[in-house]
């Protein structure tokens, strides 16, 4: 074996020389240089400094401006809540542990950190699934009389939490487990061992099928149909120019969110899948650390995309920050905001 397995950890380093120690008790400087741990800490600090204000501001601005409380925005706000879970429940602890060179909070802290990181990532993924379905129903109109309303949005939010908990909670109940990963300063689901005592193999298969592959299939199907429908409608001029423009802008925003999600999470999922299907193979701690920490940047891109591509939200945010006056001169009362007929989201 090219790694060292303990009762509640797996260190990707052979203990042939006897240097491996528990990542809950000793610094892991035999895995990497101390400066590399410091770089990880600096990166986590950057994500906290950027991630908390922008996600909190997204929630605060929506509470302050009633016009932003539209059904589709409920799902987008759900993304902000998920990102805050990741920032507060995961990033802060990882910053602290990186500074110490090992996971100082012990197995219980590892469970909590892994739970919040998994929960936030899964809420984001299933929120994108709900957004894809909403775009498909609104634009492709498989149900001609359907209107995406507040009740549908609330059910969509509830669905994302149920599915996220169905992925994040089982390791706390004994189906699989959370262990330190990479440089042993952050925790995630155990992809490294089969661990029959906790039926780890069945859980990892379940997670990859139900909580990654199926959502991706739904998302790609919905947007494949959507692109075809938008092109067909444009060719036949079935909708008014204003409605077409608004629907295209909202669709473009959501598609960019999906692409950003894939850029952040597919490398992590791919490496995790490789590790799981190549048990005992030779790989270093950096092999998993880089995609794991890169995936954490997902906490800042959704609100950035939303702010950049949604003029109505951008104006409301500037008005809130600048104490009631928009410095760009777009007065809220007089600004013309095009809303789609069904989803009521302003185009950029």
UniProtKB/Swiss-Prot annotation:
GO molecular function, one term: 11-cis retinal binding
The record's account of how the chain is modified after translation: Phosphorylated on some or all of the serine and threonine residues present in the C-terminal region. After activation by light, phosphorylated by GRK1 (in vitro).
A Pfam family recorded for this sequence: 7tm_1
Membrane topology (Cytoplasmic): 62-73, 134-152, 225-252, 310-348
Residue positions, PTM Phosphoserine: 334, 338, 343
Family: Belongs to the G-protein coupled receptor 1 family. Opsin subfamily.
Name the record gives this protein: Rhodopsin
Organism: Homo sapiens
